[in-house]
Amino acid sequence: MESAVDPSRGFMKDVKRVIIKVGTAVVTREEGRLAVGRLGALCEQIKQLNSLGYDIILVSSGPVGIGRQRLRFRKLINSSFADLQKPQLELDGKACAAVGQNSLMALYDTLFTQLDVTSAQLLVTDNDFRDKDFRKQLTETVKSLLALKVIPVFNENDAVSTRKAPYEDSSGIFWDNDSLSALLALELKADLLVLLSDVEGLYSGPPSDPHSKLIYTYNKEKHQNEITFGDKSRVGRGGMTAKVKAAVHAAEAGIPVVITSGFAPENIINVLQGQRIGTLFHKDAHEWAQVKEVDAREMAVAAGNVREGSRRYLQRKGNKILLKIADALEANEKIIRIENEADVTAAQEAGYEKSLVARLALKPGKIASLANNMRIIANMEDPIGRVLKRTELSDGLILEKTSSPLGVLLIVFESRPDALVQIASLAIRSGNGLLLKGGKEAKRSNAILHKVIIEAIPDNVGGKLIGLVTSREEIPELLKLDDVIDLVIPRGSNKLVSQIKSSTKIPVLGHADGICHVYVDKSANVEMAKRIVLDAKVDYPAACNAMETLLIHKDLIEKGWLKEIILDLRTEGVILYGGPVASSLLNIPQAHSFHHEYSSLACTAEIVDDVYAAIDHINLYGSAHTDSIVAEDNEVANVFLRQVDSAAVFHNASTRFSDGARFETRRRGWN
């Protein structure tokens, strides 16, 4: 679930000097104590960037809040019970700043020292900047520190500052640490200013409002009158309002600014990699083309509304819609192939892995296969309204459990455009609204397939039943739509599935790896075994039901069958890796792990003693997807079928038969 590089942030590759401002809400926890974990992650990022050659300057808030918490505790332990009954006076902020500054810098020094980094403290006031000599000396000092790889840590010297509230006035040089960081960015000629906050960036409204949208690029002409600011930070001076003013000031002077969350441990590094994180302020933003993008939330709401309005029609006519779409796919095969070939060519030129390119390609006959599978689903028994269970609660009172649509589904899928067709057909047949987010490598293929499908949907249902997210919204943003999306189904790598499961409150239905095995028993028909093994590996190597591990009974070595099977695989271009026994016997590289999905013309081979050893191997290293035995001994086959713990277990059949359309079930779209 990695974020892609945003073209509008391509300038990040040229950034050398970065000023990072961290707010009080990031530095401290809710109760006012130091957020040691967050500060540790911040220092680790700064260490990494420092090692990469970046000039890093830190502006840190927090002393007043930290000092207040410490002085309150000190006052509490020195107070009598009678003292505590009296009205409590607010602590002097300047005294709080003096106490807190020491604690904050002590922590920074400790953290940086553990990382073999040296830091330096610089306290300033607004009056200091009225002196030209001060500004010149400040620049020289910082230049010397950066040359020595020292991290300058700035803060306003609140303990002796003479400025009175309100902090912002027309004559002020700066009025808080946000404006201080903007001023320093100009004085020290920074290439980028990063303002870390307790929210992910600038929203169109209060971040707590589910209808507020994160603004990725701030356009003053467009946004300044549209934004509704919520409450200020729980502990800072000005909150988001102050950050926006400081960011606009710096951006207009030519310093790009990004406001982002200080709670995510890798955000600064991700920003510098050009990822679309937080809100960017740039002097040229008003000149960038403003593309009208349909918001994913709007799509999800529209899909839900269409689904509700067309529920009865979909239940009665959903099969006919699928038959019409199947015909449309075949009628538009030529243009679909053209768009898909463009994606494949672009992926090859970009240097994508061969396994990804293989999943991306719609081979000859694939469109016809998708259309035929859609017709199979259309002719299935109606999945909605079926009575699954009936219970008599009392005399004459019957409780029925019936199947019904889930609602609006978000499907996140990688590489494979055929998945779009499979998923759309299942959604229509089951009466669900759909939001699709495909990989950028299949952009053109997904777009044409989506267009063909929605144009075949009758007007009284509407194409909004199935939405394709083509905006630059990243998956993390989609996973926040828990109020309008009912289920997330990820189809892709184990990494994608795991990341989605840990990143959303929406229920997730997803599988992990497709580590499928074929075990060839000593009783196998060798010709049948060779055909099954070749089909399982070579037919579609990138499929999740392709064979990844070949297990062979030890007795087949003496019979010479092992060499025949291996020779056939090599003839088809399959790269072989071995377990401890097979690698030595066949003189092939040893596999680094038995739990590995190649998704290409490669597989692992290993020798086992008997069917029980094969079963133990599969249950230990497999992914519970699909596993097959090739055997003429029915007793051995039945042991395998009963004891292998997988979703599909076959006897004398290729793992490639593990397909929902062939099973005439709905599961294919979700696998």
Swiss-Prot record:
Residues 1-297 are annotated as: Glutamate 5-kinase. The keyword Amino-acid biosynthesis applies. It catalyses: L-glutamate + ATP = L-glutamyl 5-phosphate + ADP; L-glutamate 5-semialdehyde + phosphate + NADP(+) = L-glutamyl 5-phosphate + NADPH + H(+). Feedback regulated by proline. PROSITE patterns: GLUTAMATE_5_KINASE, PROA. InterPro entries: AceGlu_kinase-like_sf, Ald_DH/histidinol_DH, Ald_DH_C, Ald_DH_N, Asp/Glu/Uridylate_kinase, G-glutamylP_reductase_CS, Glu/AcGlu_kinase, Glu_5kinase/COase_Synthase. Expressed at high levels in leaves and is inducible in roots subjected to salt stress. GO terms for biological process: L-proline biosynthetic process. Pathway: Amino-acid biosynthesis; L-proline biosynthesis; L-glutamate 5-semialdehyde from L-glutamate: step 1/2; Amino-acid biosynthesis; L-proline biosynthesis; L-glutamate 5-semialdehyde from L-glutamate: step 2/2. One of its GO terms (cellular component) is cytoplasm. Substrate binds at S61, D158, N177. In the N-terminal section; belongs to the glutamate 5-kinase family. This is Delta-1-pyrroline-5-carboxylate synthase.
